[in-house]
Regions:
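Bacterial N-terminal signal peptides
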Residues: 10-22
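Acidic, small-residue rich beta-repeat scaffolds with periodic aromatic anchors
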Residues: 19, 24-37, 49, 125-131, ...
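Beta-strand-rich domains and repeat architectures in extracellular enzymes and scaffolds
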Residues: 27-66
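Structural motif
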Residues: 55-69, 111-119, 167-178
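Blade-loop segments of beta-propeller domains
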Residues: 78-95
Length: 203
């Protein structure tokens, strides 16, 4: 009977311990960073993140630490667009067009994939464009692929860079390409240039 009571007591103690740990983890307050202001200074990106997951340098918020991503109006900080529910975390900076009506950003979708997303301003609202795969055919069997925005050539025309690693040690390729978005939000590749091609063993 005494042994049974001890076992029950130990089980209760463990349950209380794990409950406290869970509550503590849920109660960790998020830190916030406002960054990537639009050229007209009317908008910015607010990142909510877990400060316990920041690297020692703390210069850049890793995707794994990101909990919230919001486009906010300045200076009121009213949320204009919430893209927190997107899979992955922000990779690098948000790239704004010269007229502050377009912005593009890369999302890290794990260790093997990074994709670029684009948003467009209509009136006082921003909408995410429902683009299909925003990339080009690198000419091989791809294992890893990372697409990031570089700059807006002009409003509506975006320059991107795509780095692809091929399966079976077949090397890699880096391609820069430009896309133009039409009135329906669909993109058309207007130029492409392979700037590097090499063997994976060289990396």
């Amino acid at each position: 009977m005494l042994s049974m009571r001890r076992e029950v007591g130990n089980a209760l103690a463990l349950a209380v311990f794990f409950a406290c740990v869970t509550v503590f983890a849920e109660d960790i307050p998020l830190a916030e960073k406002v960054t990537d202001f639009s050229p007209d200074k009317k908008f910015a990106v607010r990142i909510g993140y877990d400060p316990s997951q920041l690297p020692e340098s703390g210069d850049e918020i890793p995707p794994d630490a990101t909990r919230k991503l919001e486009l906010i109006a300045m200076p009121s900080e009213e949320v204009v667009l919430d893209f927190s529910n997107e899979e992955g975390g922000l990779q690098g900076k948000v790239i704004w067009s010269q007229d502050s009506k377009w912005f593009a950003y890369a999302l890290s979708l794990g260790q093997r994939v990074a994709e670029t997303r684009v948003c467009h301003r209509s009136g006082e609202r921003f909408e995410k464009l429902k683009t299909e795969y925003l990339g080009v055919d690198p000419g091989g069997d791809v294992r890893n692929e990372y697409v990031k925005p570089l700059r807006w050539v002009k409003p509506g025309t975006l320059l991107l860079e795509q780095f692809s690693i091929f399966r079976g040690g077949a090397g890699d390729a880096t391609i820069q390409f430009a896309v133009r978005f039409d009135a329906d939000g669909k993109f058309h590749v207007v130029s492409r240039k392979k700037i590097r091609e090499g063997n994976e063993q060289e990396n």
